[in-house]
Amino acid sequence: LVTGVVYPLTRALFGQRLRQPLGREVVVSRGLAERLLADGAWRSDPSSATADLWVIAKAAAHDTRIAQVYLGPRTRPPPQPADVSQAVARVLGTVFQDMALHAPRWQRVRGSRPVPTFGEEHLPGEPNPPPAPGPLVSAFGLGWQDLRALWGAVLPPQTMLALQRVPRDPPEAFRMPDAVWARVVYDFAVGWHMKIMDREQLLRSMTPLYLGWVASFVNEVGGLGRPETEARVERLCEAFEAEKPYLISRWRWPDRFTP
């Protein structure tokens, strides 16, 4: 979720290249802490798993100086399939809420700039093996079969057609273009903002689309080293930035804007 959605989306929104917006460890200045305490939003769910993302969004939206520090690899168990839909709904719900809160700010931001980085990156000795693309593509196909009508209420016809044309056989040939994925994320953000349906239902319905993107990414970076993989992530982020005018237009004029 961080690589495919949270990082490229928050980078395009707020213009700061913070690689791990869900880094979990956050250090704040006294001034920022006072501003955060004055904001009553955190009191509604102070133990939220996405509280760190809320802090970072508040800082980025108010031009607070931000830096990132390498703390070393963290071993975490891979998410179970049953948890993916819940994670998508929880994380994207927080991101989309931050988008709504700070819309006047991010609509003025263009491009992005590097964030000061300290420390040395230490890669894990044995990274988790990538998931097999077959089950991911199958999940996307089932989503297309069962949720196509719902997706059509969120996505414009051009995007639906682009998704339909993505090859699924063999699974290793599955590729989701960066611009299409960026527009999918942006359109779901607009749909959440406009409350076109139950928000939880909308967010969970995005899971097969996300799994399709994961399959595409795995197919592209499988066998690549860390530098080449990060270069691929950079191209994805550039696509999100290039498609930001589309997001702004949809956000401002959701009813009369024709993609």
What name fits each language-model region?
Residues G40-P46:
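Conserved nucleotide-sugar donor-binding catalytic segment
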Residues A12-Q16, D39, D98, H102:
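Conserved, well-folded catalytic cores of nucleic-acid-processing
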Residues R35-L36:
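Residues that scaffold the ATP/ADP-binding catalytic core of kinase and kinase-like folds
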Residues L1-L32:
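Acceptor/aglycone-binding surface of glycosyltransferases and processive sugar-polymer synthases
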Residues P46-V55, A87:
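Acidic donor-binding loop at a coil-to-helix junction in glycosyltransferase catalytic cores
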Residues R90-P259:
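Terminal low-complexity segments of carbohydrate-biosynthetic enzymes
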